[in-house]
Design a protein with these regions (language model features):
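Conserved Rossmann-fold NAD(P)-dependent oxidoreductase catalytic core, especially the SDR/UDP-sugar
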Residues: 82-87, 91, 96-148
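Amphipathic terminal alpha-helices
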Residues: 297-314
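N-terminal Rossmann NAD(P)H-binding glycine-rich loop of SDR-like oxidoreductase domains
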Residues: 3-25
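Active-site Tyr-X1-5-Lys
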Residues: 140-170
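Mid/C-terminal beta-alpha module of Rossmann-like enzyme folds, strongest
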Residues: 18, 217-271, 311-314
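A conserved pocket-lining segment of Rossmann-fold NAD(P)-dependent short-chain dehydrogenase/reductase
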Residues: 139-147, 187-209, 213
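NAD(P)H-binding glycine-rich loop region in Rossmannoid oxidoreductase-like domains
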Residues: 32-41, 45-96, 100
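Glycine/proline-rich active-site loop of Rossmann-fold NAD(P)-dependent oxidoreductases
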Residues: 126-127, 156, 165-168, 179-189, ...
């Protein structure tokens, strides 16, 4: 299969490009930064330089290229966003960027288009013990909070464009929180080491996914995903943020996180929303239709792998 990957040097893009190339696929990696060319070649990809938000430049970059599938993973995450404005660039990549990538997909003759989304698209807040599936209405009730609505609206728009695209099999992947060796956990580990990431009293449950399992699910969706479908890509056991962060801090030798009442994090309004959301998400559809299952089923197996990778890199 010939695959074009946007966001090819990101936390998910790098291991995905590596896995696709190792699996015998021809990969073109889209990057905004010319300095990433050598890195993409080392991963086994043909580098293409363009800004996803610049449609004319993007179409020039892919001119003459022919692929079977396009994977749109482009985000603007560099560090963990703390305030709503830290999500603005990613929101634009999910709206205008998705529209531009669909135009590029048509230009290169792609038959499949996969777009990144997040389980937070179900809506920030406390879902209690309810287990969310793809049958649940995504994107929550609009208007509850202007900042949160901007993020949810961007995911809503990306998914709508992806799943209703004419002449192309569009698939939306709703990833859980990424963690694992390398960039997937570097920001959190650094914040824990500096005691800059507290645990909040009584707050927050999240469905995570180990980064290599996110890669495997993406490859499975490329090969077996159904057109017009969304898939939750999460592990088998939701975990309280406080439990996960304490375990990760201990495993990597960081000091125990400070404990704070949740209201003290409100000035960091995006982080407050993310860490106080309680969300349990099912991966049954991805298991059933993609033939995928997480190799790291829970955080209990995943946290030691992060610690081991850090020791090996030291």
């Amino acid at each position: 299969m010939k695959v074009l990957v946007a966001g090819s040097t990101g936390a998910l893009g790098v291991p995905l490009v590596r896995a696709l190339a190792a699996g015998g696929h021809e990969v073109a990696g889209l990057t905004r930064n010319p300095a990433n060319r050598a890195r993409l070649r080392a991963l086994g990809a043909r580098p293409l330089v363009a800004d996803v938000l610049d449609r004319p430049g993007l179409l020039r970059a892919v001119d003459g290229l022919t692929v079977d599938a396009v994977v749109h993973l482009a985000t603007a995450f560099r560090d963990m966003p703390m305030r709503h404005h830290g999500m603005a660039a990613t929101n634009e990549l999910r709206t205008r960027g998705t529209a531009n990538m669909l135009a590029a997909a048509r230009a290169v003759g792609a038959g499949r288009f996969l777009a990144e989304s997040m389980i937070f698209g179900y809506g920030y807040g406390d879902w209690g013990d309810r287990v969310l599936t793809e049958e649940d209405p995504p994107f929550g009730p609009p208007g509850r909070n202007a900042g949160l609505e901007a993020h949810v609206a961007a995911m809503r728009e990306s998914t709508r464009r992806t799943l209703t695209a004419e002449g192309i099999a569009g698939i939306s992947l709703r990833y859980g929180g990424f963690y694992g060796p390398g960039p997937a956990s570097e920001a959190i580990v650094e914040l824990l080491r500096r005691r800059r990431l507290p645990v909040l009293h009584g707050a927050g449950v999240i469905s995570l996914v180990f980064i290599q399992d996110a890669v495997a699910a993406t490859v499975a969706a490329l090969e077996r995903g159904r057109a017009g479908q969304a898939y939750n890509v999460v592990d088998d056991e939701p975990v309280a943020w406080r439990t996960f962060l304490r375990a990760l801090a201990e495993a990597v030798g960081a000091p125990p996180p400070r404990e704070l009442p949740a209201w003290l994090l409100r000035p960091a309004n995006y982080a407050h929303a993310a860490f106080t959301t309680s969300m349990r998400v099912s991966n049954a559809k991805a298991r059933r239709e993609l033939g995928w299952a997480p190799s790291v089923p829970t955080w209990r197996e995943g946290v030691p792998l992060i610690a081991a990778a850090l020791r090996n890199a030291a």
